Amino acid sequence: MGQCKNVSSHIMPINESPKIIFTRYLYVKDEVTLTLIMSILEKRESSMFWAYELYYSGFENEVFNLLWKIYFDFYYTLNPSFYDYFIKKQKEWSTMRPTMERDKIINMIVSDLLIRPHNLDVFLLRQISQNFDIDLETNIFNDCQLFEFIHLSKFDDWFNSKNYQNIAEFVLNKCCENQLDEFLEYATSYFKTPPNNKQTKDYNAREKINKRKNTDQREKRHIILAHIMMQFTCLEPVKMGKKLYVIVEESEMKQFETIYSDYDSSFYPYKILPKACLYSIDEENYLTLFKLKRETIDLKDAYFNHWEYYASFSPVWRDRIKKYNGVANHENKKIDFPDDDCFDEFYDAFNYETDEQKKETSNKSIQNLTNQRKWSQVYEQYKKNGIFKPEPEFLEGLDKIEY
């Protein structure tokens, strides 16, 4: 038998946008993201598995961005002090070479979220503003020049009456970009004015935004809303999270490392998925609350007949395929190899044989989903720590949301 020679300089780039992406162990990427969110809120041990399924698939920066989004949506209002710790740990991660010590930082952050209280306030405010038309009962917000002279009395009304939905709509959708800082100044001064200043926290929101490198306008608006809701939360008899931080030992990381075949011990590639896929993608039936990529494709056909193609869009699989000079064939949804040697060597290492797996294994990734939950039920489940009480018609009207 010959040997596959590296000719990577001649390989066509894999740059077409796919309908789905398979991860390291052939879960659908967007579903791993959503299951991670819900498992963290449910305080489940499986949270760590889903976090590392994304992380070790090569989506390292995306995992950090997702955890920031989760933090601002669900945790910031009750745990504002965690912000600086999060910044510190991400900075450490960015300066370290790839080691287990570096990788365990994700474990530390997720573990810290699991022990902290959370609510749905910011998340629901964002979703309602995104999915419904909120009438602010005025058209002057279209004129940014009128901000200083007209808006302030309206803001006073909103803040004094705790009209969180109008505040959110203004921050997220109506406020002009060049007026965001001015509105933040107004909010800051409001909470520094007696009697509010006796209970609120002196956190500099602008400083927090500046600490988050490469913050775009959407994230900036998200942070501002979370900051305002945190200050309102301080005015209520709600228990805030404690400054506790989890220590993670390297020995705890072994279970999340990528599993490879080992012919010497007769552990062949087709044995990887049954061992590695520890959890089903939707054990708690939350996924039907969201818009999913699987709705745009024949998922079973993709999994059984074209998994290599859809996996090639994950960095870990892209690098594996590139090592054996594979090229994505976008027309046939296959991976083409330049010769039999490259083909054989790739499959000697990674022939997962999805079409031969037991249903128990394949269903971990491509199970049929059951529509059992509504957002109104999720709100009832997590409303204890929140201060925002959405109108019932909003909760009933929320269907499949895009996160």
Q: Predicted regions span which residues?
A:
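Long, low-complexity, highly charged intrinsically disordered regions
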Residues: C4-L36
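C-terminal alpha-helical interaction modules of replication/initiation AAA+ assemblies
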Residues: R24-Y25, E45-F49, Y55-Y403
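Conserved helicase/translocase motor-coupling segment
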Residues: E31-I37, K43-E53
